């Protein structure tokens, strides 16, 4: 059955299947070649800029990171991506070793950031926020309960401090960067989605660009009665290097035999 012949009923998934679908979509990730079929090329020391379209249903705040590693490494590096508008996210990482690498995009609902966004909007509009403050204290307590020390102790201290403040002071503390940092460490990554893992082939720097110098070894001689040798070429290497060349290129070198030489038919 083609898309053109689908009826509206065919496009509606059963509730049991719909509930299993991810809330977060990760699309149009770059750099990617043929959906990850082939590896992106890079060189050691290159900064790789990554862009992606990430969105979800509703108005919750998203957290998006790049996960990357050298293929032989067990652990992943993480780089926070920035929201650039219109569901666009961007970030970058630098590869420092030669060999195969891989990366993917990881996204989740940032529960505390979503709470802070709503709290700020309502507080600035003069809307009563007593219920929101109660919800926020509950979020901090839940974060403490799922964390280990010393993070647990710091979150419990934050919860205790919030409980003794006036409403305006609680708002200020909830919106403080230190509170966001603590809650980020304890985030349970709600509705986590992970993209396809994409390969990167990291080459040595000269694989991207190099200056090539070509010469004929037999012509490198200071004696008209003697053809040049590789030893004569060795003596020329400092001069070639000083001219700014990186690679020495030889044309095809054919051995000359006494009986079946290249010039004999």
Predicted regions and their residues:
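Aromatic-lined carbohydrate-binding/catalytic grooves of carbohydrate-active enzymes
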Residues: 206-230, 240-264
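Non-catalytic, glycine-rich low-complexity segments
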Residues: 2-57, 116-147
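N-terminal carbohydrate-binding accessory modules
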Residues: 186-208
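Aromatic-rich carbohydrate-binding modules that target alpha-glucans
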Residues: 57-96, 118
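Extended acidic/polar, glycine-enriched regions
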Residues: 82-133, 139-190
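Short, polar loop/linker segments at the starts of domains and inter-domain junctions
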Residues: 39-44, 48, 219-234
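Beta-sheet entry/capping signal
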Residues: 63-65, 92, 100-102, 246-251
């Amino acid at each position: 059955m083609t898309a053109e012949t689908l009826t509206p009923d065919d496009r509606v998934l059963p509730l049991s299947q719909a509930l299993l679908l991810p809330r977060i979509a990760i699309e149009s990730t770059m750099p990617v070649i043929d959906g990850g079929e082939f590896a992106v090329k890079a060189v050691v020391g290159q900064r790789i800029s990554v862009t992606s379209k990430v969105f979800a249903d509703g108005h919750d705040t998203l957290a998006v990171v790049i996960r990357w590693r050298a293929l032989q490494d067990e652990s992943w590096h993480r780089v926070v991506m920035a929201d650039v508008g219109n569901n666009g996210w961007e970030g970058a990482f630098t590869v420092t070793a030669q060999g195969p690498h891989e990366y993917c995009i990881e996204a989740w609902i940032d529960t505390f950031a979503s709470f802070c966004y709503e709290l700020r909007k309502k507080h600035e509009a003069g809307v009563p926020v007593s219920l929101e403050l109660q919800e926020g204290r509950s979020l901090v307590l839940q974060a403490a309960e799922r964390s280990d020390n010393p993070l647990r102790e710091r979150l419990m201290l934050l919860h205790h401090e919030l409980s003794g403040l006036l409403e305006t002071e609680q708002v200020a503390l909830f919106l403080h960067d230190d509170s966001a940092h603590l809650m980020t460490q304890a985030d349970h990554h709600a509705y986590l989605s992970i993209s396809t893992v994409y390969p990167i082939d990291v080459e040595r720097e000269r694989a991207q660009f190099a200056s090539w110098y070509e010469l004929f070894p037999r012509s490198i001689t200071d004696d008209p009665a003697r053809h040049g040798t590789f030893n004569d070429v060795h003596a020329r290497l400092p001069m070639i290097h000083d001219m700014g060349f990186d690679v020495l290129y030889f044309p095809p070198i054919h051995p000359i035999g006494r009986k079946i030489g290249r010039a004999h038919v």
